[in-house]
Amino acid sequence: MKRILSALIVLASIGAQAQVLYVNNSDNTFEAVNTTNVKQITFDSAQQLVAVQGTDGTTSQYATAKVDSISPCNNGGAALTYSNDRTVVFDAADATNFPEIVETIETDTLIDESGDFVENYRTTKIITINFSETGVTCNSNVSDVTYTVTNNSHIVINSTRSKVGYIVRGTCSNGSLKIYSTKKFQIMVNNLSLTNPTGPAINIQSGKTVYFTLGTNTTNTLCDGETYAAPTIAANGSEEDQKGTLFSEGQLIFNGTGSLNVTSLGGHGICSDDYIRIRSGSITITSLKDGFNTNDKFQMGRTANASPIVKIKADGNGVDCGKGNIIIEAGKLGINAGGEALKAEYDGTDTNITANTIISGGYITARTNDEKSSIFKTSGDFTLNGGNIHGDVKGNGSKIINSNGNITIRGGKITGIVDGSLSSDTTTAGGFKCDGDLLIDNGTVALNCKGEGSKGFNCNGTMTINGGDITILATANNFVAAEYDRKTRAITGNNITINGGSVFAKSHDHAINGTGITVNNGAVHAISTNATAVNTATTQTGGWLLTQDAQ
């Protein structure tokens, strides 16, 4: 009774000069509501919830156990703590202000990762390969590193020697380098410009690690041809791979501070049948197929002295990992892809293989153009620990994140703009799509899904928000056709639990649609322009639930 009388007295005392109504919480926080819109203050039958109802259709609901008092302010001393309108834009500052993880060089040779660091590799033999328009020369004079040259400028190296390094330089518009090696080795490109009109510019037929060093203050260019010649037949009778402009059977580890420009007219840009790791350097790829294509993982980090800058324009996927993880910890990565921007997808039957995506630092800006493409496509889990991401998808049925597993946001910032509507097979466009659970502990998520029938969050598992700042806009009309009807919603899923943070969801249809929503803490603002804002059973033990139904 005391709470009811207090609410009535407060409502009656709001005069013409009062501008802000404060709801003061027991944890010393408050919400400020515009009094000019206050219609009434009510309690539920059990007096567990108090609701401030506005003439504009808004309802601000609180758990009475967490509210100390409700009081008006006549001097307009504080701004309102909510707005019914938000925008989603790409912040230019994200490109310069982002966290990075500086790698630790592993020196323990018993740990596999130690093999990724050229700092642990000491060359004992340096061989120089010079290309020119009239031919290629090689200064190898040892029996365990032999070479042959065909058509003046196509050189093949055969090596059984360990701790060898190749300095490759010069300019040639019709040449190539192929290396067979039983040991790991280092390639140091030094102002190399090499084009092979009939295949890869560099083809490494070795399953061993290759340290690919971009010489300081050097600019290097590789290009293949539109049509590849018939592949070489290996000793076992199989055809040798020649999948792109720069191809390796083994691991490719990039380091150095120079630049590498790769153009692929007939295959992938840079390809490994193992994994690719970029530690530093500037790499630009223009590719007919994928930018980077790996059979295993793709990893970007940074050394203590430099971080990588990678730019990809690909008609296929920007980065494609067949059965490995995508790991990005530092650097700048820009992608304009016809297909998926970053794809870690394993479609085999080995249950021990998972393809996850883990972003812990750096700045990623990516755009996709094809139908049903995504910025991140992963058959495993997607995790954002840190870093800034800008995603712009244009195709119908496309997503910012499309995960067959779980999506976890622990920090960082992701901004996504989705322009597409339904695809030809009625797949909806949207922000986050996960077949598993969605967990947000911290960070910033801002999504604007502009197409008809779009979904902001679409989660088949449970959805838990413990913190962070989340904005989801999905305000286009529903997609209505003779045979189906796809609703435009900000959040749709099963059980949704809000334990903290700020959630702003605005949509044409229900802003929140699910099996049930529980608000224990935090602020949830749900607005619908054409339906009820929340279409699910609601339990509230704390926090602030502001809803605005269509008028």
Segments from the language model and where they lie:
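Sec-dependent N-terminal signal peptides
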Residues: 4-13
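Sec/Tat signal peptide C-region and signal peptidase I cleavage site
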Residues: 14-18
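Extracytoplasmic low-complexity repetitive segments enriched in small/polar residues
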Residues: 19, 33-34, 48-50, 60-67
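Short polybasic amphipathic segments
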Residues: 19-23, 48-52, 77-81
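Short N-terminal segments immediately surrounding and downstream of signal-peptide cleavage
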Residues: 20-38, 54
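Structured surface patches comprising rigid loops and adjacent beta-strands/short helices at the edges
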Residues: 35-43, 63-72, 91-98
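Mid-chain, structured segments of secreted extracytoplasmic proteins
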Residues: 55-79
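A composition-driven surface/loop motif
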Residues: 82-83, 96-551
